[in-house]
Amino acid sequence: MKYRELGSTGLRVSEIGLGGEWLQRHTDAEVCAVFDACDECGINVVDSWLAAPDVRTRIGDALRGRRDRWVIEGHIAPTWQNGQYVCTRDLKYVEPAFRDLLDRLHTDFLDIGMVHYVDRPDELTEMLNGSPFMRYVQKLKSCGNIRHIGISTHNAAVAQMAAQSGEVDVILFSINPAFDMLPPSEDMSLYFADEYRSDVSGQIDPARARMYALCAQRGVGIHVMKAYAGGRLFDARTSPFGAALTPVQCLHYALTRPAVASVMVGCDTPAHVYAAAAYETASESDKDYASVLAAAPKHAYGGQCTYCGHCAPCPAGIDVAMVNKFTDLAALQPEVPDGVRSL
């Protein structure tokens, strides 16, 4: 495993990281097995925005006895209300949710306190102007409960503002070849629209390119989410390029962007961990994404869910992300897989 400096934080992180979002439906033993596989492969950084108490406990128990070897990136703003995830800046909910996170992870600090899901420039402006929420985050840093401040966003304009602010050390940003062709927006639906905007199709959006360069200049580290676009890039039928990319190609694309230190890969099983870590021994030809992109059509990216869960909470209590995931798994097969049918 190769390790990279995370901006100016002084942290060295494995270039393959663990995204914890798919651990929520697994047992204690299964979650522990994923962390065992990560240790075996040299992975030392985990990102988790999950608010559900049970999965926080499972991750914390899996980290017990190895906390000092792991860089933990935990999110501030996800809360658990009435059995559902709710993202809020209301300190009445945020403060107990953060204390709960530390307690369940069996630690008294997070290496990175990630301000969760900031996609609107006006919201970031309010935070940077000293909102109560941001004052709380800064207090956590001054007290040592978080060592570095991060922001997660899908919007390059927000990421650029964060990098320029001097307040943010790390940005968690969605990076893959498809998303790089889309314009910055606070409307996430554009990332899954039927077509790319014509003036950015086939080339990296200039705003995203500027943001990557600015982060490299300012020493702001980038962690990557959605490198696989929810698995859509692995199938020619769902890829905007009309041809499938491999996990290795997607990882290489993300890791060759300026300022990127690590890609957070969502892993259900040890096999997923090993598949991601195989990047480290892949040949240059295996990593070559350029040949696929060179033949990419200019338009027609069919809109699809990437199961991020940001549409929550559902008024009817439905786990929309998981319903969409299993629907898509079924639709890609001639018959409904047994594993989906049994759910």
PLM features per residue range, with description:
Residues 2-7, 56-65, 94-105, 159-166, ...:
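Short amphipathic alpha-helices and their capping/turn segments at secondary-structure boundaries
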Residues 1-76, 80, 108, 142:
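N-terminal binding-site loop/beta-alpha segment at the start of enzyme catalytic domains
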Residues 19-29, 79-95, 124, 235-244:
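Active-site mouth loops of central-metabolism enzymes
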Residues 23-29, 47-57, 79-81, 88-89, ...:
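Acidic-and-aromatic substrate-binding clefts and catalytic sites of carbohydrate-active enzymes
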Residues 6, 18, 38, 46, ...:
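Conserved, mostly hydrophobic/aromatic
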Residues 100-124:
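Active-site groove signature of glycoside hydrolases
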Residues 25-38, 89-106, 153-161, 245-253:
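Short, acidic/polar
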Residues 118-343:
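Beta/alpha (TIM)-barrel catalytic core signal, keyed to glycine-rich beta->alpha loops juxtaposed to Asp/Glu
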